[in-house]
Amino acid sequence: MCEAMDFLREVIGDKLILGCGVPLGPAFGKVDYCRIGPDVGLNWDGSPKERLLHRERVSTKNTIGNTIYRRQLNGRAFWNDPDVYLLRDDNIRLSAKQKEMLAQVNGLFGGLLFTSDDVGTYDEEKRALQQSLSALREAPRSVERKGKYTIVRYQGQDGEKELRVKL
C-alpha cells in the first residue's frame, strides 16, 4: 500500500488528494486530507444486529470517537476528514444534542468541514451553529477520559464549554 500511495502522489503531483478508505499509515505525508473513521450514520450506533456482527460499521458514535482519538494526526500526517456533520431534521434519528455534538467535534478536530444537508433549509439556530464551526479549530482544548465518558473542554466565544461523550 505504501508503494501505491507513493505512485499516486507521484502521478497526481501537487494536486490535492482526499484519501478515503486508505489505511492511515501509508497515507502519512502522501495525501492532503484523509478520512479517519467510519461513515456517519443517520442514527447513533446502528441496529443491535449491526453492533453484534460488525465493529467497523456506519456509526455516528464511532465516527465521533475516531475524530476525538485521532485528533493528533490533524495537520501533522494530513488534515483529518471526520466525515460529514448532519444538522437536518428530516430522514435522521439523531437527537438535537447528538447532531450538535457531531458538528462541534468535527469543528474542533477536523481539517475539513462537510455536510450532506441542504443548508438552505437550516433555521437561524442551525445556521448560527454552522457558522461557528470553523472558529472552533483555533479554540484551546483538552481531552480526558473519565469512566465511560470522554470529556472535551474548549474555549467558546462565550466562555469555557464542555462536551461529555459516552463512547
Positions of the model-derived regions?
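Short, surface-exposed, charged/polar-biased interaction segments
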Residues: 22, 29, 38, 126-129, ...
